[in-house]
């Protein structure tokens, strides 16, 4: 494999050269020497990172609106869910693969290195989505890390088949479980089942938790207590948590204490603003809650827009909750880079011995990249320059 050297890259806060050999970062430092066999890539002091991290998506249901019969309509979450179920009944492995692959390729082009997606598992679609996404995970394994959560979108106990399907999804190779506590009207029982199965298979769990924004759906106290009871603190990522925005100041303080005690990680999906308030991100950051950002739905019945470029979510959240100062810009940047990677338990570093995964920009600051929605100037994965 030929050697690559990025010259004068802004990385880890300093201008350095980065030598890549055999898919690994072999050396870093100022003014490294290069032999004639080394391909030089001048960066002119521009920013280089490993890549972006998208902590939550639904790529198995992406691009449904691209099909003529699937038109977006304004309506309630229940109505959109019903339309999705009609579409899911027609899913094939090939269909899911084609639509999901489009998101994966677009995400890679945008600089995404790590993507966690939920994948519906139920009596309607069976394990078709899991089969399709596992194939894509292998196909693109040198370009992007794909984490797959077997997701109980339609609930667990309504059809008598979903419990076994979720377990089979884990046996097939799904990385973790996904719970949807609002769906079946049995939120506590839903949490119990997902945690018990996750414990059995020693995997983590994602929960769409308190996503309605309504106080009657507030399940954080129950989940936190269950995690403590089962000694599973630190193994759950909570998505949305919109109900936090409906709490009083004192209630929010107590909620954050529960989040910290249970070592809960939280992923914000800013597009939820279309139907309810999103969680108070600044309060969570101030308390030290691990946070990530996710694209969530992409061009389907729940969201007719999006592309799988998580920078869009960073810009949207910046506007929605006034992340404007230098310190606040840095917090948003961390949610789609190192902080997001930590939330997902993924490797994320540029240092000698690390995998040669680098994403370069014609920009010197994160603020410029987010503001201008800049695409990478160069993408390197496993030591190879990508042309995708």
Label every model-predicted segment.
Residues 1-5, 10-49:
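Histidine-rich, glycine-flanked metal-binding segment
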Residues 63-96, 201, 219-237, 255, ...:
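Active-site gating loops and adjacent loop-to-helix segments of metal-dependent hydrolytic enzymes
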Residues 65-118, 124-139, 164-171:
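Alpha-helical scaffold segments that flank or form the walls of functional sites
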Residues 128-142, 159-237, 243-265, 275-293, ...:
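Histidine/acidic residue-rich metal-binding segments in metalloenzymes
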Residues 46-68:
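Di-metal (Zn2+ and/or Mg2+/Mn2+) metal-binding site signature of metallo-dependent hydrolases
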Residues 204, 226-236, 282-361:
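His/Asp/Glu-enriched, well-ordered alpha-helical/loop segment
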Residues 352-388:
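C-terminal cap of metal-dependent C-N hydrolases
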Residues 9, 23, 45, 56, ...:
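Divalent metal-coordination and catalytic microenvironments
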């Amino acid at each position: 494999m030929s050697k690559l050297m990025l010259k004068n890259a802004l990385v880890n806060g300093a201008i350095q050269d980065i030598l890549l050999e055999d898919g690994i970062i072999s050396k870093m430092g100022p003014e490294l020497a290069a032999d004639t066999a080394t391909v030089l890539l001048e960066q002119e002091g521009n920013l280089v990172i490993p890549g972006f991290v998208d902590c939550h998506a639904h790529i198995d249901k992406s691009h449904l609106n691209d099909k003529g019969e699937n038109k977006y309509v304004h309506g309630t979450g229940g109505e959109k869910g019903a339309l999705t179920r009609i579409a899911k009944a027609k899913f094939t492995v090939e269909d899911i693969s084609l639509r999901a692959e489009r998101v994966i390729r677009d995400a890679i082009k945008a600089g995404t290195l790590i993507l966690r997606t939920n994948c519906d598992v139920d009596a309607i679609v069976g394990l078709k989505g899991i089969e399709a996404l596992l194939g894509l995970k292998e196909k693109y394994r040198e370009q992007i890390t794909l984490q797959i959560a077997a997701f109980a979108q339609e609930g667990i106990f309504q059809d008598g088949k979903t419990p076994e399907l979720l377990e089979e999804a884990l046996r097939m190779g799904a990385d973790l479980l996904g719970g949807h506590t609002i769906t079946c009207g049995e939120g506590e029982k839903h949490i119990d089942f997902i945690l018990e199965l996750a414990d059995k298979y020693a995997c983590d769990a994602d929960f769409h938790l308190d996503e309605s924004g309504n106080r009657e759906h507030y399940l954080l106290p129950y989940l936190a207590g269950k995690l403590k009871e089962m000694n599973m603190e630190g193994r759950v990522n909570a998505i949305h948590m919109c109900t936090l925005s409906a709490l009083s100041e004192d209630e929010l303080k107590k909620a954050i204490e529960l989040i910290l005690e249970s070592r809960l990680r939280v992923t914000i999906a800013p597009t939820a603003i279309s139907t309810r308030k999103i969680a108070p991100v600044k309060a969570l950051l101030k308390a030290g809650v691990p946070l990530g950002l996710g694209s969530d739905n992409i061009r389907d019945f729940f969201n007719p827009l999006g592309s799988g470029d998580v920078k869009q979510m960073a810009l949207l959240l910046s506007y929605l909750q006034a992340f404007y100062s230098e310190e606040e810009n840095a917090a948003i940047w961390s949610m789609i880079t190192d902080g997001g990677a930590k939330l997902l338990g993924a490797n994320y570093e540029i240092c000698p011995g690390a995998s040669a995964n680098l994403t370069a920009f014609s920009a010197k600051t994160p603020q410029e990249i987010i503001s201008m929605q800049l695409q990478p100037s160069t993408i390197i994965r496993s030591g190879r320059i990508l042309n995708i």
